[in-house]
Amino acid sequence: MALNLVGWNVVLDSDNADELSAFYEKLLGWTRFPGEEFTVLANINQKGFPTWITFQQVDNYVPPVWPATTDEQQQMEHLDFHVENVEEAVKYALSCGATMAGIQYDEGWRVMIDPSGHPFCLLPPPPWIK
C-alpha cells in the first residue's frame, strides 16, 4: 500500500517567516500565499500534484550550524534544488540573499545558507531524470 498523495510540502521554521518566504519566492519564482499562522509558497504551475513550502514563525528559533556539531543546534532537514548550471544558480542564490557555506564537501554541488540559517544544496540533476 502507498499513500494516495494529493500534494506534499516541507515546513521551515524561522524567527522571520515573512522574510524567509520572500527569499524563497525570489529564488524559486513560486507563488506566495500569506496567512495568519503560516506563509505558504507553492509551485502552482507544475503538472501533477503541487509542491509547496510552508514557513512557520517560531519566536525562539535557533538556526542550525553547518557543518553539524554535537553541542549546537543541528539541522532537522535541508532542501536540495537540482539545477541545470550549479555556478549560475550559486550566483543567483547569492543575489537573492543566500550565503555560501564556509565548508564545501564536493566540487560538483554547493551548500548554501538561507537568511534563517537553513542549509540548502544546489546540485546538477541526477542521471535518472535526464
Give residue ranges: language-model regions.
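Short, acidic, Ser/Thr-enriched surface-loop or helix-capping motifs
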Residues: 114
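Mid-chain, well-packed structural core segment of small domains
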Residues: 68-93
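Core segments of cupin and vicinal oxygen chelate
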Residues: 2-4, 11-58, 89-111
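A short, acidic/glycine-rich surface segment
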Residues: 61-67, 130
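N-terminal beta-strand motif that seeds the catalytic metal site of vicinal oxygen chelate
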Residues: 1-22, 34, 74-83, 123-130
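Tryptophan-centered motif/residue detector
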Residues: 30, 38, 65-76, 109
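Acetyl-CoA-dependent GNAT
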Residues: 57-60, 125
